[in-house]
């Protein structure tokens, strides 16, 4: 990785906006909408703001997908209103419950099922909305999540294009903090899965800053944390079968094993 390279959030914002514009010219059409799941978290919030800057609010359509009662859904309303985008709210809990009943196994109670089925149902919902409105689904995950595998295959890993696959949590935050249209508390809120009541970092047993320090600076945490990180990374290698086009971070050079994405240059 280039040791003298410094991430410039404004440069990345400008580049990402241009990438979005070119993607929709070449891969879609003048009326095609961007369809984005709005969770109220930093990634979907910042991605939505970038899409609005690139395409205009009229071509960005949000989808709110609580599973039952979502305690922080007010944050999803807040960002949609702040950006002036239209949105649908679809509670996926009834469909998820029917699915569990159809499967008919007590094993539906295990955490892997309870975590991954709603994530996949959300992606099914996004593609249904995309078909209705004529749109492309944006993936809002980041490199830090992807590297450690804190994602769901065919759930939040899916989409038509991927805005942050080359950016760590640290870098996405740097971008969001200089975008004045975004309420700051939505940028800085702790990432959470919305189901267990815990943050992502609680669930993983590692902080995003520790992941980013390794990815960007080759700084290793303590032995136990590194063992946890590396084991999670290795166990989740199978998720890398899904590669989407997306912008890259300028000037970055990669070491084998750290990254695997598809960066499309127009």
Q: Predicted regions span which residues?
A:
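Conserved G/P- and acidic residue-centered "switch" motifs that form tight phosphate/ATP-binding loops
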Residues: 41
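Short, surface-exposed alpha-helical segments at coil->helix boundaries
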Residues: 44-48, 73-77
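Short, well-ordered alpha-helices that flank and scaffold nucleotide-derived cofactor binding pockets
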Residues: 49-53
């Amino acid at each position: 990785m280039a040791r003298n390279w410094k991430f410039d959030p404004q440069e990345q914002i400008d580049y990402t906006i241009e990438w979005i514009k070119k993607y929709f010219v070449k891969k879609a059409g003048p009326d095609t909408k961007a369809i984005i799941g709005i969770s109220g978290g930093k990634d979907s919030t910042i991605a939505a703001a970038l899409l609005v800057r690139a395409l205009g609010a009229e071509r960005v359509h949000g989808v709110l997908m609580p599973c039952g009662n979502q305690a922080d859904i007010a944050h999803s309303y807040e960002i949609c209103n702040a950006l002036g985008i239209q949105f649908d709210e679809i509670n996926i809990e009834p469909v998820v419950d029917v699915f569990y009943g159809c499967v008919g196994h007590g094993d539906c109670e295990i955490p892997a099922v309870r975590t991954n089925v709603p994530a996949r149902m959300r992606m099914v919902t996004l593609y249904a909305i995309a078909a209705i409105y004529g749109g492309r689904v944006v993936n809002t995950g980041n490199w830090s999540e992807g590297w450690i595998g804190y994602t769901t295959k065919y759930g939040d890993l899916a989409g038509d294009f991927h805005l942050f696959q080359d950016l760590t949590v640290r870098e996405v935050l740097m971008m969001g903090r200089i975008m004045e249209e975004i309420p700051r508390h939505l940028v800085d809120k702790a990432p959470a899965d919305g189901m267990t009541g815990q943050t992502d970092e609680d669930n993983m047993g590692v902080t995003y800053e520790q992941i980013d320090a390794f990815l960007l600076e080759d700084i290793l945490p303590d032995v136990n944390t590194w063992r946890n990180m590396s084991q999670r990374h290795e166990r989740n290698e199978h998720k890398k079968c899904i590669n989407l086009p997306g912008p890259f971070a300028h000037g970055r050079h990669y070491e084998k094993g750290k990254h695997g994405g598809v960066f499309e240059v127009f």
